[in-house]
Every structure is written in structure tokens, then in C-alpha cells.
């Protein structure tokens, strides 16, 4: 894809906007045809057109990447708060009892049983689920115990009109299928 900078966005911001931290999971996926939750949710027409369009001939201005990068930054910041930050002190400030804080484990192995009473918190974990001849994959935002959270940065219109609620619920349901 060709990139322009028609808005003359300053170099530090432009470089940040052009970062793509997406990892499909293909390198660690089990054998089979891989299909992501987000791809599965796209309209059929969009999926067909994406395969027909030569992306090397398409052009995008770096200014069009702001909302996408802001959403990605929100996810990164939340993840870092739990993996690199002092989440224990933050929970104490929020008046959580120390007995609860002591039970929390961040990203414990999903394939091993947890000790009784442990509260697992999983952040940005990718999962795979075989379904017939495909491998469905998705990366959840935040799972605390068995309660799933998905962080969205969306337009005011989408929020107030609730126009994307069904899509958000479907995404959550598919993640629940992958991460039972």
C-alpha cells in the first residue's frame, strides 16, 4: 500500500501512526485453514473485494490512521497497566481488599489448572478453536475470571445509537466460543 502525508503530520506522529502491531497468530496456530473472528464478521462483499483489490496499488493518507492507532494505543496502555504497572496499588486505591489482590494472577498458563481461589486475568491472549475444517482464531482484550471485557473506541453516534451493539455482542460470543 502506498502512503501519503497530505496533511503534513509531524514525523514523530507519522511514524507512530504507521506502526502495525497486529499479529494474526498464524505462526503459532494449529494446522488448518485459519479464520479470524474479525474476518468472519466482515460482510461477504467486503471479503470478496479485499481478495480482488491489489493493495500495492492502493493509497492511504497517514491522517486516516489516527482512529485505528488511538484504539490500538488504548489496548496497549491497558495491557501495560496490568503487566508493567503497579496494578496492586491501583486496586488498593480503589478499596479492593488485599485478600482479593493477593489471589490475582496475570496471564497464567491457560493449559494448566489454577490453584483454588486464584483469580486469573488474561490480557491480549490469542486463542484457537477447531470448527469443522477451519481454525477460528481471536485475540481477547481482557478476561477476568470468566468475565470477558472488550475495549472499544467508537464514535459518539455508534455509542448513542447503539448501532454496533449486535456486532459487539457477536464478537464477544465468538470469543466465548474460543475461550470457554
What is the predicted function of each stretch?
Residues 76-82, 161-180:
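Metal-dependent nuclease catalytic cores in nucleic-acid-processing enzymes
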Residues 151-163:
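Short beta-strand-loop-alpha-helix junction that forms the active-site gateway
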Amino acid at each position: 500500500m502506498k502512503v501519503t502525508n497530505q496533511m503534513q503530520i509531524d514525523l514523530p506522529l507519522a511514524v507512530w501512526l504507521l506502526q502495525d502491531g497486529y499479529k494474526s497468530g498464524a505462526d503459532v496456530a494449529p494446522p488448518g485453514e485459519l479464520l479470524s473472528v474479525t474476518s468472519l464478521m466482515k460482510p461477504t462483499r467486503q471479503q470478496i473485494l479485499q481478495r480482488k483489490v491489489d493493495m500495492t496499488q492502493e493509497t492511504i493518507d497517514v491522517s486516516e490512521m489516527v482512529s485505528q492507532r488511538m484504539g490500538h494505543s488504548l489496548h496497549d496502555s491497558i495491557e501495560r497497566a496490568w503487566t508493567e504497572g503497579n496494578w496492586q496499588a491501583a486496586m488498593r486505591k480503589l478499596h479492593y481488599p488485599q485478600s482479593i489482590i493477593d489471589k490475582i494472577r496475570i496471564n497464567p498458563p491457560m493449559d494448566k489448572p489454577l490453584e483454588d481461589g486464584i483469580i486469573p486475568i488474561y490480557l491480549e491472549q490469542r486463542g484457537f478453536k477447531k470448527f469443522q475444517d477451519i481454525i477460528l482464531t481471536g485475540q481477547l482484550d481482557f478476561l477476568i475470571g470468566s468475565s470477558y471485557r472488550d475495549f472499544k473506541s467508537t464514535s459518539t453516534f455508534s455509542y448513542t445509537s447503539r448501532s454496533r451493539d449486535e456486532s459487539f455482542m457477536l464478537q464477544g460470543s465468538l470469543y466465548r466460543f474460543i475461550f470457554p
